[in-house]
Amino acid sequence: MTVEEFIKQNAEQIKTYPLALQALWHDYQENWHQSHSLIDTAGDKDSAWVHAYLHRKEGDIGNARYWYRRSGKPESRLSLSRERQEIARVLIQEITN
């Protein structure tokens, strides 16, 4: 599945995906709050990566740095749209392999 195909999924289809991908899908639908609420208490590294991106998007860089550390990923220097696309690509690849 491509990122473009992922974005076009509907809300019912994404419920079968890991929490991090569900949260990212909601961000693609421009629903930051739903995205954040899905991963706010998640403890896995993929969710922490999405959480970092969301706080970076929000402008809360200190909190974003905390979540990048939790995710084991370096702090992104990409544009927000490119970072989101890269996260989506990696997470989609994890479920399709």
Model feature map: region roles:
Residues 9-10, 52-61, 77-97:
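TPR/TPR-like alpha-solenoid helical repeat scaffolds
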Residues 10, 36-39, 43, 72, ...:
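A conserved position within tetratricopeptide repeats
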Residues 39, 45, 49-56:
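Acidic, aromatic-enriched beta-alpha/helix-loop junctions
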Residues 13-19, 43-48:
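Generic helix N-cap/helix-start motif at coil->alpha-helix transitions
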Residues 1-11, 24-37, 89-90:
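Repeat-mediated protein-protein interaction surfaces in helical alpha-solenoids
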Residues 20, 32, 39-40, 68, ...:
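Inward-facing hydrophobic residues that define packing positions of alpha-helical scaffold repeats
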Residues 43-45, 57-79:
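TPR/TPR-like (Sel1-like) alpha-helical repeat modules
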Residues 21-25, 53-55:
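Residue-level signature for tetratricopeptide repeat
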